[in-house]
Amino acid sequence: MSRPTRIYVVDNGGQWTHRIWRVLGEIGCDSKIIANTTPVEEIEADALVLSGGAPRITWESPKMGKCIDYLQQFDGPILGICVGLQLMALHCGGKVGPSDVPEYGLAKLRIIEEDDLFKGLPREFHVWESHNDEVKSAKGFTVLAVSDNCSVQAVKHLEKQYYGVQFHPEVNNTEHGEEILRNFAAVVKHRRD
């Protein structure tokens, strides 16, 4: 019997970081929350989730700790949530800026590109948003989903094992949030095995 998929949650100060950890545990992953200052060489995980958080990435990126190191040196899939996605996009040459319409609450997500992250899910469903900034251009990524007010709601990198979502799959209000995290865990397990 193989060991559970080990996915660590990098704490970027988000109010729902513990929910990511809890959902991952509920779906059978070996998960723990780690500080975003944890050195890469101390991380013994199959994958990372860069949690959301309060930093405005365009001028408060130092609050993201060693997340750039993780993107440069961690050898495994990474899922960026909210500010985690924004940092990932910026690091890969994209642009991040203030949202034309800041979002807080439910939004209708539309999947525009099939991918394992949304495997088995409907083409449209409601997700929980909480952001003032957003990815304006996602250089090096395929955009997987959009909403009425945000043209980059979910992405997958063209070459690296990077996934990102602007919304919060860990929040109860997000329909199919557990399935999205389960699908990410399946991608990680497939890569590991």
Named regions from a protein language model:
Residues 4-10, 14-81, 92, 186:
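Flexible gly/pro-rich beta->alpha loop and the following alpha-helix that scaffold active-site loops
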Residues 65-81, 86-179, 186-187:
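Pocket-forming structural segment of enzyme catalytic cores
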Residues 3-4, 30, 38-39, 113-124, ...:
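Short, glycine- and charge-enriched coil/turn segments that flank and shape catalytic ligand pockets
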